[in-house]
């Protein structure tokens, strides 16, 4: 995935997903990408 930093956390983008996977934390919505930013960033 692509690295992202939304809010106070860093993570990776999950494109075209309305929400993060259950084992991932939600950092925030980045308007300039079609996806959500989820942690951890691996």
From Swiss-Prot:
Region span, Play an important role in the folding and structural integrity of APETx2: 13-14
Keywords: Disulfide bond, Ion channel impairing toxin, Nematocyst, Neurotoxin, Pharmaceutical, Potassium channel impairing toxin, Proton-gated sodium channel impairing toxin, Secreted, Toxin, Voltage-gated potassium channel impairing toxin, Voltage-gated sodium channel impairing toxin
Residues at the site labelled Important in ability to inhibit both ASIC3 and Kv11.1/KCNH2/ERG1: 33-34
Pfam families: Defensin_4
GO terms assigned for molecular function: ion channel inhibitor activity; potassium channel regulator activity; sodium channel regulator activity; toxin activity
Resulting phenotype, residue 17 to E: Complete loss of ability to inhibit rASIC3
Cystine pairs: 4-37, 6-30, 20-38
Residues with site note (Probably important in ability to inhibit ASIC3): 24
Record bears the keyword Disulfide bond: yes
Site (Important in ability to inhibit ASIC3): 1-2, 15-17
InterPro entries: BDS_K_chnl_tox, Myo_ane_neurotoxin_sf
Compartments where found: Secreted; Nematocyst
Result of changing residue 32 to A: 2.5-fold decrease in ability to inhibit rASIC3, probably due to alterations in the orientation of the side chains of neighboring residues of functional importance. No change in ability to inhibit hKv11.1/KCNH2/ERG1
Any one GO CC term of the record: nematocyst
Residues carrying the site annotation Important in ability to inhibit Kv11.1/KCNH2/ERG1: 8, 18
Effect of residue 31 to A: 2.1-fold decrease in ability to inhibit rASIC3
Site (Interacts with ASIC3): 31-32
Mutagenesis / variant outcome for changing residue 34 to A: Complete loss of ability to inhibit rASIC3 and hKv11.1/KCNH2/ERG1
Miscellaneous comment: Negative results: does not block rat ASIC1a and ASIC1b (ASIC1 isoforms), ASIC2a (ASIC2 isoform), and the heteromeric ASIC2a-ASIC3 channels. In addition, does not inhibit most of voltage-gated potassium channels tested (Kv1.4, Kv2.2, Kv3.1, Kv4.1, Kv4.2, Kv4.3). Does not inhibit Nav1.3, Nav1.4, Nav1.5 and Nav1.7. Shows a very weak inhibition on Nav1.6 (17% inhibition by 1 uM of the toxin).
Family membership: Belongs to the sea anemone type 3 (BDS) potassium channel toxin family.
Physiological role: This toxin potently blocks acid-sensing ion channel ASIC3 homotrimers and heterotrimers containing ASIC3 (composed with isoforms of ASIC1 and ASIC2). It also weakly inhibits potassium channels, and sodium channels. On homomeric ASIC3, this protein shows IC(50)=57-87 nM on rat, 37.3 nM on mouse and 175 nM on human channels. The blockade is rapid and reversible. On heterotrimeric forms, the toxin is less potent (IC(50)=117 nM on rat ASIC2b-ASIC3 channel, 900 nM on rat ASIC1b-ASIC3, and 2 uM on rat ASIC1a-ASIC3).
Protein's name according to its UniProt entry: Pi-actitoxin-Ael2b
Organism in which the protein naturally occurs: Anthopleura elegantissima (Green aggregating anemone)
């Amino acid at each position: 995935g692509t690295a992202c930093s939304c809010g106070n956390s860093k993570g990776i983008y999950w494109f075209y997903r309305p929400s993060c996977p259950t084992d991932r934390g939600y950092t925030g919505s980045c308007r300039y990408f079609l996806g959500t930013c989820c942690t951890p960033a691996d």
